[in-house]
Amino acid sequence: MTAPSCAFPVQFRQPSVSGLSQITKSLYISNGVAANNKLMLSSNQITMVINVSVEVVNTLYEDIQYLQVPVADAPDSRLCDFFDPVADHIHSVEMKQGRTLLHCAAGVSRSAALCLAYLMKYHAMSLLDAHTWTKSCRPIIRPNSGFWEQLIHYEFQLFGKNTVHMVSSPMGMIPDIYEKEVRLMIPL
C-alpha cells in the first residue's frame, strides 16, 4: 500500500460490520443506527459526524459537529460533487486532533465511497489500495456501480491513471475487482 502506515490504526481488533469501523486513526465508518448511539460516539471520541444520506436523521449531541451530505444511494446520484469538500472536511478535523464518523444508512455504499475518495486524496492511495484497506476494516463495503464510475474518474483526476476499471458482466457494469466474485455467483 502506498499510504504511510503511521496514519492507520494497528489492527488489534476484528473488523466491525455493525458498530463503528475504524479506517484511520481519525476516521470511522458506520451505519445510521450506530451513528446515533451516544455511547459509541463518546467511547470512540467522535467530534464530527458526516451523514451521507437523505433518509437517516441524526440525534444531535453536544460537543459533536454535524454535516449533512444529502445524497441518495442511486447510481445516478452525483456523489462526486462531494469528494473534495468531504475529504477536505475530514482532513481539517484530523488536523485539529478530532475524529470523524462518516455514515450513511447501512455503512456500505455512500460512506464507503467518500472514504475511498478521502484515502486517495489525503493518503495518496490508489483506488485499489484504498478499497483493499477499507474492506479489511469494514468487510461489507460495496459502493454502487455509479459511485464506482465516479471514483474511477476521480482517481484519474488525482493520479493520471486507474487501478480499477468497469467491466461488463451478467449483472451489468461492475468494477473489475468484483469480477471473480460475480463469476462464482453466476454459473456460465
UniProtKB/Swiss-Prot annotation:
Reaction(s) this enzyme catalyzes, per UniProt: O-phospho-L-tyrosyl-[protein] + H2O = L-tyrosyl-[protein] + phosphate; O-phospho-L-seryl-[protein] + H2O = L-seryl-[protein] + phosphate; O-phospho-L-threonyl-[protein] + H2O = L-threonyl-[protein] + phosphate
EC class (word): hydrolase
Gene Ontology terms: cellular component: cytoplasm; mitochondrial inner membrane; nucleus
Keyword Nucleus: yes
Keywords: Cytoplasm, Hydrolase, Membrane, Mitochondrion, Mitochondrion inner membrane, Nucleus, Protein phosphatase
Pfam families: DSPc
Gene Ontology molecular functions: MAP kinase tyrosine/serine/threonine phosphatase activity; phosphatase activity; protein serine/threonine phosphatase activity; protein tyrosine phosphatase activity; protein tyrosine/serine/threonine phosphatase activity
UniProt-annotated stretches for the region Sufficient for mitochondrial localization: 95-141
Record-linked SMART domains: DSPc
Domain of life: Eukaryota
Family: Belongs to the protein-tyrosine phosphatase family. Non-receptor class dual specificity subfamily.
Function noted in UniProt: Can dephosphorylate single and diphosphorylated synthetic MAPK peptides, with preference for the phosphotyrosine and diphosphorylated forms over phosphothreonine. In vitro, dephosphorylates p-nitrophenyl phosphate (pNPP).
Full protein name: Dual specificity protein phosphatase 18
Name of the encoding gene: DUSP18
